[in-house]
């Protein structure tokens, strides 16, 4: 779905491999893609609050000032939550833009139009991350049965 959307919008796009939940492997593969000259690297999945989720942390290893806004916050240590929330990540390493999105197809689909628009317009990583996070927060509230205009908390 992502590959087709990028190609339909004039981008050259390749499918990457499915990676194990290992932060060293993940950040190494991102670095390899950067070194191979990819200008936009989008990952899906691995943005949750469990120990196995490392996508955002891998981007932060490569870009210490990456934008990593929360979609939702949790109390760390409750249930499966080993982190304090679910975040997405948008980083910049040289000319490569790195984006970590959630894995569910409906959430990826929701982000495609904004992602393409932001890349084309040259939005900063902070603006792009903020716009994507806003969309995803709204979707989460919809899934929970809340109307976003009445219950949305701003996270930074």
Describe the predicted segments one by one.
Residues 1-156:
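Non-catalytic beta/alpha edge segments that cap or flank active sites
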């Amino acid at each position: 779905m992502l590959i087709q959307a990028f190609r339909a919008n004039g981008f050259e796009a390749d499918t990457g491999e499915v990676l194990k939940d290992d932060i060293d492997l993940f950040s190494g593969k991102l670095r390899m893609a950067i070194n191979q000259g990819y200008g936009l690297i989008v990952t899906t999945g691995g943005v949750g609050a469990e120990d196995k989720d490392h996508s955002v942390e891998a981007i932060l290893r490569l870009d210490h000032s990456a934008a990593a806004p929360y979609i939702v916050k949790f109390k760390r240590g409750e249930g499966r939550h080993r982190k304090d929330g679910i975040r997405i990540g948008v980083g910049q390493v040289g000319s490569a833009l790195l984006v970590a999105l959630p894995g569910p197809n409906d959430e990826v689909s929701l982000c495609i139009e904004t992602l393409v628009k932001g890349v084309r317009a040259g939005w900063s990583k902070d603006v792009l991350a903020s716009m994507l996070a806003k969309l995803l927060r709204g979707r989460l509230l919809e899934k929970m049965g809340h109307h976003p205009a009445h219950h949305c908390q701003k996270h930074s």
